[in-house]
Amino acid sequence: RICYLAPRDTQICAPGQEICYLKSWDDGTGFLKGNRLEFGCAATCPTVKPGIDIKCCSTDKCNPHPKLA
């Protein structure tokens, strides 16, 4: 699987990691900064705490930055 690890950087995931994910959350820095983002690969869709959004998918490059998609 090939997943984004940053807005424009991709990586071939390790064996067994067939899920790409994009986590987003408000870090409390205010309107101008917006949400924080975390991109990655995983074996299963990660569990997140309340207030954190996560999108998981299972095709190559399926977790792009929302503004670059």
Curated annotation (Swiss-Prot):
Cysteine pairings via disulfide bonds: C3-C20, C13-C41, C45-C56, C57-C62
Biological role stated in the UniProt entry = Binds with high affinity to muscular nicotinic acetylcholine receptors (nAChRs), whereas it binds with a low affinity to neuronal alpha-7/CHRNA7 nAChRs.
Q: Does the keyword NAD apply?
A: no
Q: What family does the entry list?
A: Belongs to the three-finger toxin family. Long-chain subfamily. Type II alpha-neurotoxin sub-subfamily.
Q: Name one GO molecular function term.
A: ion channel regulator activity
Keywords attached to this Swiss-Prot or TrEMBL record, sorted alphabetically, are: Acetylcholine receptor inhibiting toxin, Disulfide bond, Ion channel impairing toxin, Neurotoxin, Postsynaptic neurotoxin, Secreted, Toxin
Its primary localisation, in coarse terms, equals secreted
A cellular component term, taken from the record's GO annotations = extracellular region
Tissue expression, as annotated, is: Expressed by the venom gland.
- Extra information: Has the length of long neurotoxins, but only 4 disulfide bonds, as short neurotoxins.
Output the lineage of the source organism.
Eukaryota, Metazoa, Chordata, Craniata, Vertebrata
SUPFAM superfamilies, per the entry: Snake toxin-like
Protein name in UniProt: Toxin Lc a
